[in-house]
Each structure stands twice: as C-alpha cells, then as structure tokens.
Amino acid sequence: MNNLRPALGIFGGTFDPVHYGHTESVIVAAQQAGVQSVAMLPCHIPVHKNHAPSDSHHRLAMLKLAIEQYPQLYIDEREIHSDTPSYTIHTLRALRKEYPKHPLCFFIGMDSLHSLLSWNEWQALFDYCHFVVCCRPGTKTPLSEELKALLVERQVATNNALHNALHGKIFLADTPELDISSSEIRRRIINNLPTDDMLAPKVRRYIQTHKLYQPSTTF
C-alpha cells in the first residue's frame, strides 16, 4: 500500500470560449482515470495559439458559468492573472511544491499529444505529472516515430498506475466524439450561425450580452 494522496487533475486551455467539448470530455476522462476533481486552468498568454485570446475576465466569467453544474470541476486562476506566457512546466513545478504527495494528472486532447514534443522542456513534464489524453474527432494524423516510442515507454492500460506513482505515465481515455472547437464557435458566431449544441446556455447568453466574437472583436 502506497502513501500517496488522491490524484489531482489539471486541464489547461484558453477556453475562448469554453464549450461542451471541454467540459464533457474532461468529465468522462476523469471518470475513466479515477480522478475525483479537476482544476480548470485558464491561461492568460497562450504559447501554442496563433490568435490573441479574448479578455481574460470574459473567459474566466464564461468558465465559471460553464462548470456550475459540475461539482468535480473547479478553477485555478494562477495562470490567467499572470503577465507572462503560460508554460506548463512552470505551473507543474509550482503545483508539485504545493501537492508533494498527490499524483498530478494533466489532461490534454489528442491534438495536444501530437504537439507535445514542441512544448517547453517537454521531457521534464513527466517528472511532475501523468498525462491523461482525451481523444478528439478529426485528429487522425499518424503518430511520429518519437511519439510512438514515448507511448511504448509510458502508456498504461489501466488507471491504477496513475494512482500508484506521482508522475510519468500516459493514459488514453475514450472520450465522447464531440466535434466542437472554440475556433468553430467563433466562426459560427461571427457568421450568425447557431451554437446551441456547443455551448452551455449561460455561456451563450453571456456571449450575446457582452457582444463577444463580433466582426470588430480581435481574436
């Protein structure tokens, strides 16, 4: 029997806007990984995005509305209030100091797995966390040989390994096939197309009230 505390989940993103593809996928992935709570970690200055995100206070407000119905989810605001780019390695080092006995499970999409080798100090990430990968439609790109080797080395078939070690494993979760992206939502809003099946009603109303993602909006 190990002396580890319950595993903690972290799910980072710009959430511009947050949508069902975020919330539903991470809830299912957390259940499969055996993780009881997940911190939603909105970033202020994204490193891997090619557009400037909406104002942080809007993204944070929408995220708070979106997770009201999910008691498993809460918000960690450390990155969104930072004036420097959000590098995962820096956040994980801080979290490890705060939670030395808890396995840390960092949730990402399959698209992020494909780009993982370009992340800052990516090899060192495995010294701080496990990765739980949420499968996502439209990411059928073949894995590189380096990624294949990484999965051979670190992938685990069951979630037990995530709770018996502090870090170092990759768990592939079978998440719902929700073909939703924030960029598609922004495109639909700017073209006055419906987004009812993509966004929580309160988030949709917030966007309408504050006139976000209109033609004059920079994103």
Swiss-Prot record:
Q: Which SUPFAM superfamilies match?
A: Nucleotidylyl transferase
EC numbers listed for it are 2.7.7.18
Q: What reaction is this protein's catalytic activity?
A: nicotinate beta-D-ribonucleotide + ATP + H(+) = deamido-NAD(+) + diphosphate
EC class of the enzyme, as a word: transferase
Highest taxon above the source species: Bacteria
Biochemical pathway? Cofactor biosynthesis; NAD(+) biosynthesis; deamido-NAD(+) from nicotinate D-ribonucleotide: step 1/1
Q: Which InterPro entries match?
A: Cyt_trans-like, NadD/NMNAT, Rossmann-like_a/b/a_fold
Alphabetical list of CDD domains matching this protein = NMNAT
Q: Which GO terms describe its biological process?
A: NAD biosynthetic process
Keyword GTP-binding included in the entry's annotation: no
What molecular function does GO assign, one term?
A: ATP binding
Q: Which family does it belong to?
A: Belongs to the NadD family.
Q: What does this protein do?
A: Catalyzes the reversible adenylation of nicotinate mononucleotide (NaMN) to nicotinic acid adenine dinucleotide (NaAD).
Name of the protein in its database record: Probable nicotinate-nucleotide adenylyltransferase
Gene name as annotated: nadD
